[in-house]
Design a protein with these regions (language model features):
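N-proximal low-complexity "stem/linker" segments adjacent to membrane-targeting elements
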Residues: 1-37
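Cell-envelope/extracellular polymer assembly enzymes that use nucleotide-activated donors
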Residues: 13-16, 44, 173
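Conserved donor NDP-sugar-binding/catalytic core segment of glycosyltransferases
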Residues: 109-140
């Protein structure tokens, strides 16, 4: 699953941000903006999409950043999300890989803070212990309960287990494996990541309403307004 890592001249490790996307060019553009705003260098963004996804291909044609690489995968046979994530890891050049979901917002300090947290803990990987939720339908913002939030994973590429060949829950298995090996650090900086709840989420709205929202805390109105502005621009 590994290719040769590429640190920069100063020896700072390259971080590969891995984005699997399909048919969401507006959200993808925000994910690209978040990548461009990162304070960590060197970094690269890998965007994995399927060959029948014309909307993503058209969006990619407008971006010419040297540190953004597009990986087009044949649409047939159909691959699971786990399989597509494995392709992204295999294509990554970084010493670290970071899950970079296209529908969420990533603070400019996210990569720097998580790599630093992993290194300080002597761990191979780091996830956030809490993050923020933005419910786009209701226009409400929350802070999550404390747990290992899989979507925020930043990990050494050589420590990454394969994602299971499933369409949902693939990142949970990877994080559980890293934790079981004692390789996982947790960072409690919820403002580094805003998870967007919307109609196209992998798990659907019922998962938010039944499993996540009951354990989350609604944010005060002034903070909620800042979250709204951050996510919607």
């Amino acid at each position: 699953m590994q290719s040769e890592s590429a640190p920069d001249d100063a020896g700072t490790p390259l971080v590969s941000c891995l984005c699997v996307t399909r048919g969401r060019p507006r959200l993808l553009a925000r994910a690209v903006h978040c990548f461009r705003a990162q304070t960590w260098t060197p970094r690269e963004l890998l965007i994995v999409y399927e060959s029948d996804d014309a909307a993503t291909r058209e969006a990619l044609a407008a971006w010419h950043d040297e540190d953004i690489r597009a990986i087009e995968v044949p649409a047939v046979p159909k691959r699971t999300l786990g399989a597509l994530r494995n392709i992204a890891v295999a294509e990554a050049r970084g010493h670290y890989v970071a899950q970079w979901d296209d529908d969420d917002w990533h603070a400019p300090q996210r990569l720097a803070a998580q790599v630093d947290a992993a290194q300080r803990a002597g761990a191979a990987a780091c996830v956030l212990a809490r993050w923020l939720f933005w419910d786009a339908q209701a226009g409400e913002a929350y802070v999550s309960a404390r747990r290992a939030w899989e979507g925020s994973l930043v990990a050494r590429r050589d420590a990454m287990p394969d994602y299971p060949d499933v369409t949902r829950g693939e990142d949970s298995e990877v994080v559980r494996s890293l934790a079981a090996q004692g390789l996982l650090a947790m960072l409690d900086e919820p403002t580094l990541y805003i998870y967007t709840v919307h109609a196209g989420n992998t798990w659907g709205r019922a998962h938010w309403e039944d499993k996540l929202r009951p354990h989350a805390q609604r944010l005060p109105a002034d903070i909620e307004a800042r979250v709204r502005l951050t996510v919607t621009g």
